Amino acid sequence: MGSKSDWLGTMEHCSNTLKQFGIKHEVRVISAHRTPKRLHKFLKDAEKNKIEVIIAAAGMSAHLAGVTASLTTLPVLGVPIESKLKGLDSLLSTVQMPSGIPVGTLAIGKAGAINAALLAVSILSVRYRDVLNKLRKYRSNFEKKVPKKPF
């Protein structure tokens, strides 16, 4: 996350979703603008620390996901944080990446945070059968909650 304020109401939902699947994860405050050395060190050690997917959330001039993607070959998922401009500034900063430096950008806010976790789970499910089974069960349960008729 780019700042501590990104946690409440947004990224806490990402973490809770990852916990539902038993996915071990770290939560850190790292800013592309204010703590670039911290970002470089984190990414330098990421693969050694067995990190397989990075979820980067930031608001306003949200460059965290893009800078992260430029410094690693690990999959980077970007979550734009809602802002005074309803998150549009964050969305555009996250999604508008040059060719060759991909960021998987999700929706603004809580929905994006939850979907970032689910996309990370999906990425990990390619390698880990137990994660795939949990994802299939989640999807099946999710489908059962949708009514067939409106009333």
For every predicted segment, state its role:
Residues 25-49:
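N-terminal beta-loop-helix "entrance" segment that forms/cooperates
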